[in-house]
């Protein structure tokens, strides 16, 4: 996780996406759960302003306690990041007849899907489940939360997606080649 002032941008979705492409959605879900666990522990042990959305042990602004909804925000998107990109990748591979260029493009799009899913779903869940607390934290009216959430999606989400589009195929192609070579031996 990379701290960016008010929130923490993540790069942990990248190994989760690569892992799901190589190992399949079951192991991808496990990797995603580990991503969620790292997020939970990081936000609990070294809290930032928005950590209440990722750890039920951090008090929600304006209250003395955390919320179990933080576990939904922390784990559900991350588990899905370990599942959905595999289906995107496999679907695109079938559509493009599994040639080498298609593999790189499929990995890039799968990487983008994982990044977009993570940022989009996390911020959507914050909006729908913790909108009032987010408004309190930001010092904005509740009706301004949608714009604030879209700003995060538009900044962090774009950066995280760009990294995934570049790194998932760059690393994934090498690891997939090694996996194929080892399975032939």
Residue ranges and their predicted role:
Residues 1-185:
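Loop-helix junctions at membrane interfaces
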């Amino acid at each position: 996780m990379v701290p960016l002032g008010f929130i923490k941008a993540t790069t942990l979705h990248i190994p989760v996406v690569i892992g799901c492409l190589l190992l399949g959605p079951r192991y991808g879900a496990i990797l995603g759960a580990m991503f969620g666990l790292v997020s939970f522990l990081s936000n609990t042990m070294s809290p930032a302003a928005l950590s209440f959305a990722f750890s039920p042990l951090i008090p929600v602004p304006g209250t003395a306690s955390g919320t179990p909804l933080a576990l939904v925000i922390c784990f559900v998107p991350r588990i899905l990041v370990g599942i959905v990109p595999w289906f995107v990748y496999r679907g695109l591979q079938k559509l493009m007849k599994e040639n080498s260029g298609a593999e790189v493009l499929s990995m890039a799009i799968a990487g983008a899907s994982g990044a977009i899913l993570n940022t989009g779903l996390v911020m959507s869940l914050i909006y729908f489940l913790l909108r009032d607390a987010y408004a309190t934290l930001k010092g904005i009216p509740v009706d301004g939360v949608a714009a604030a959430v879209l700003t995060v999606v538009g900044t962090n989400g774009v950066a995280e997606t760009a990294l995934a589009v570049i790194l998932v195929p760059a690393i994934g192609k090498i690891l997939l080649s090694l996996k194929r070579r080892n399975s032939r031996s």
